[in-house]
Design a protein with these regions (language model features):
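Conserved beta-strand signature within the Rossmann-like core of class I S-adenosyl-L-methionine
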Residues: 418-427
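Conserved alpha-helix/loop element of class I SAM-dependent methyltransferases that forms part
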Residues: 207-233, 259-262
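A short acidic, Gly/Pro-enriched loop at the edge of an enzyme's catalytic core
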Residues: 229, 377-391
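Conserved Class I S-adenosyl-L-methionine
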Residues: 304-315, 326-330, 433-461
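A short SAM/SAH-binding and catalytic strip from SAM-dependent methyltransferases
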Residues: 388-403
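A short glycine-rich, Lys/Arg-flanked "PGG" loop and its adjoining helix->strand segment in the class I
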Residues: 271, 406-418
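Class I S-adenosyl-L-methionine-dependent methyltransferase module
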Residues: 35, 39-186, 228, 240-372, ...
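Bacterial N-terminal signal peptides
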Residues: 12-23
Length: 462
């Protein structure tokens, strides 16, 4: 018994040392730096007429003005992450099913909030139920994160008056989200790829962009743009953290990140990469996302798999081709990176959600390294043999305006090897110079009435 205990302790020590070495190596190799003025100047010159006054104090951009502006903007964007987390809390109020039996507040009901006594009554009851749930002694992971957000904002749940204040805050956020959604719809009429440029940056995610990535990679292979075994290093911008996502999410499962492992799975299934040898980095400015991935890596070093609930909400409005294609993707997802496991049962109140689950192998989880980096204003300097074959960003650039998107396009391009690609489901402006050129567009029709189509774009590094 004693020798078994010693062996166990030695194994634990080796695992900790391995994790420390992995983390130290990653930290040394991946230190984000703000873009120098020399790199930003060509982009700034392309937008000279519309630049903020503080960037061109004498009519032209200056290095000193840039250095101050870029750091101020980075701080502002990180504040928008916290605003996005407030939206996650509001989506928990709208769509959660673990703490209430009241109907969910979908977008149709959300638009009526404040104008319909029926919806107002639902919102009031859901808020009472959520506040009551947040005061419970043993909270699940998602609830704990939302309670921590409230405390970070200065709220308490200790007394009845404290709880009244939290209720007022939650309902005010519900009204704000209603107005944000309406404004976003109006902005999308002008440019749908910048529809969220004035709202909090959400970390929520779902599987649908991962299916579009799968289709686009197939298209690239058909066009001869990608060869078998050609992908070794990948970066994902804003991998997301799925917990009550804004469209059809719920709260009966813990927060999880799916895109890194869905991408590895697709690359392996298509023969483009070896899941046990490739490297994948995530670039995110959300501490929730980064800490979540760091914890997954620590647990993987100790031999624990990463469990993902593969949630989907098929719609009767989907075209037959989209429905059959997505379901085939959904049923295969995870076979290259892990194995099926027992899913969390879907509550009756969320019966529109389908679920299956996988355990991702620890060896695959260890291939993922999170980096705290704002790709609009920061980058890492990479030697040629460490540049990326693919950088992927979905549902992220929609939170930025044209100048920010152009800075990101040029910035990301410097981290991609010649012949590599940036993939995104948002068309990026080509007004400013970059070393990325438009390459391929994939159209994915989803519905016909009303017409709805997803797109994926690839940009080739010259």
């Amino acid at each position: 018994m004693k020798s078994a205990s010693v062996i166990k302790n030695i194994f634990s020590l080796v695992a900790l040392l391995l994790l420390h070495c992995l983390a130290s190596t990653a930290a040394r190799a991946q230190t984000p730096q703000f873009i120098p003025f020399s790199a930003a100047q060509p982009i700034l010159n392309a937008y000279l007429g519309s630049l903020p006054a503080e960037l061109k104090p004498g009519g032209q951009p200056t290095a000193a003005a840039w250095d101050k502006w870029v750091r101020d903007q980075d701080k502002d964007i990180r504040v928008r992450i916290e605003q996005g987390e407030e939206n996650t809390l509001t989506n928990l109020l709208r769509l959660g099913v673990t703490y209430t039996k009241e109907p969910r507040i979908d977008y149709e009901y959300l638009a009526k909030y404040g104008h319909s006594s029926f919806v107002d009554n639902i919102a009031d009851k859901r808020t009472n139920d959520l506040v009551r749930a947040l005061t419970a002694p043993h909270l699940n992971e998602g609830m704990l994160e939302m309670k921590a957000l409230l405390e970070k904002k200065g709220y308490s749940l200790k007394t009845p008056d404290d709880q009244k204040n939290v209720k007022a805050y939650l309902l005010a956020n519900l009204a704000r989200l209603r107005d944000d959604v309406d404004r976003d719809r109006q902005q999308a009429k002008n440019n749908k790829y910048q529809a969220f440029k004035d709202r909090g940056i959400s970390t929520d995610s779902n599987l649908y962009p991962d299916y579009t990535i799968d289709l686009h990679l197939r298209h690239m292979m058909q066009e001869g743009l990608l060869k078998p075994g050609s992908i070794h290093r990948v970066a994902i911008v804003g991998p997301g953290l799925d917990f009550v996502n804004k469209k059809s999410g719920s709260d009966f499962y813990p927060p999880q990140t799916t895109q890194p492992f869905a991408v590895i799975d697709t690359l392996a299934r298509l023969g483009l990469a070896d899941p046990e040898k490739m490297e994948l980095y995530t670039f995110d400015i959300s501490s929730r996302v980064n800490k979540h991935l760091e914890r997954a890596r620590r647990e993987a070093v100790a031999g624990k798999p990463y469990t993902i609930q593969l949630l989907a909400s098929p719609s009767d409005g989907w075209s037959k081709s989209y429905l059959s294609g997505f379901l085939e993707f959904w049923q295969k997802l995870g076979k290259e990176v892990g194995k099926s496991t027992t899913p969390i049962p879907v509550p009756d109140e969320a019966s529109d959600i389908w679920n299956r689950a996988i355990n991702v192998r620890p060896s695959v989880v260890r291939r993922v390294t999170p980096i705290d980096m704002n790709v609009v204003f920061q980058s890492v300097t990479l030697p040629s043999d460490k540049q990326f074959d693919l950088v992927i960003g979905t549902n992220i650039f929609v939170y930025y305006d044209s100048l920010d998107q152009s800075l990101a396009r040029a910035n990301i391009g410097r981290m991609i090897r010649p012949g590599g690609f940036l993939l995104t489901n948002e068309a990026l402006p080509n007004k400013a110079p970059s070393n990325l050129v438009d390459s391929l567009k994939t159209s994915v029709p989803i519905t016909s009435d009303p017409p709805l189509t997803d797109y994926m774009y690839s940009y080739l590094r010259k």
